[in-house]
């Protein structure tokens, strides 16, 4: 089997392209009528995802509530657009510091990923797809990436590391007593 090498644009060039393309998409009213999530690939092509199932939204809401309660002042956002080496990706939930929030300015998507990015894993997500998103978020500047499994079980990652026992940013994010589930 032969290997494939992907050529990516330099980060600054890809970021500028992503911002232009995202602004184009947001300026088109028809996209606001589409159900589901819109992302782009590194070529600017639109990737449409079906609307999330209620369980997915429930986990997002619980994670948002816990982050809002447990983290220091900052912003907690759902469906957060982030410029990555492979286009604009939307993290299910993020926590962003006040400093990074100020750096966002008037941009329509983050050029540096929020400190914590969370992906709620859907039945259709492959392990490879989730691993790629984790890598893209770290490459874009995330300091931790969390995944939420089908039953609310959380896995925490630091850059280039195996799963962590607990979050370094939010050590109090713990499972409910007598349960494996965090949410």
Name each model feature, range by range:
Residues 1-183:
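Gly/Pro/Ser/Thr-rich low-complexity, intrinsically disordered segments predominantly at protein N-termini
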